[in-house]
Regions:
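Non-catalytic interaction/Regulatory regions outside core domains
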Residues: 2-5, 16-148
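Repetitive helical segments and hydrophobic/amphipathic motifs
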Residues: 11-12
């Protein structure tokens, strides 16, 4: 084998590894008992409007251990800090989420720390409604009690 061939193989491997690091493999089970998950998906103007609202009012997401997953047509992203930083999710995880929750049109789903769906809406939802839903959960009440 020539040196240039070995160089190309090495370079291809490095590029492959770097590309893999930009995507996060996602399994919702990994969030159980650690985080609440807000999944927003669909391909519509409602999707953008919901994100705009979250961007304005997401400062309390980390206090509520809330992770946001954004599902779009062929691309999904995740944020652990109220959309301040966003990481892409791998394609297989995107397909799994789209199929599991049937994201053909706009939808917002809230999943509790126990892994169960707590709220599901096809309409825009005020972030304060999400906060109220979370704050009414027994586990959240216990968290608030322990912090005080």
């Amino acid at each position: 084998m020539t040196k240039s061939f070995l160089f190309l193989i090495s370079l291809s491997f490095i590029i492959f590894i770097n590309c893999q690091e930009n995507y996060e493999m996602l399994n919702l089970k990994n969030f159980e008992w650690k985080n609440r998950v807000l999944i927003i998906g669909g391909d519509s103007s409602k999707f953008k409007s919901q994100l705009d609202q979250i961007n304005l009012e997401s400062n309390e997401f980390t206090d509520r251990d809330l992770v946001i997953i954004l599902i779009e047509k062929d691309n999904s992203r995740i944020s652990y800090d109220g959309l301040k930083t966003i990481k892409s999710i791998d394609y297989d995880s995107t397909l799994n989420l789209r199929n599991k929750y049937n994201f053909k049109e706009f939808k917002l789903i809230l999943i509790g720390k126990d892994g169960y769906e707590k709220y599901n809406s096809k309409k825009l939802v005020s972030i304060n409604v999400i906060y109220e839903l979370i704050d009414g959960m027994p586990m959240r009440k216990q968290e608030i009690k322990e912090r005080n």
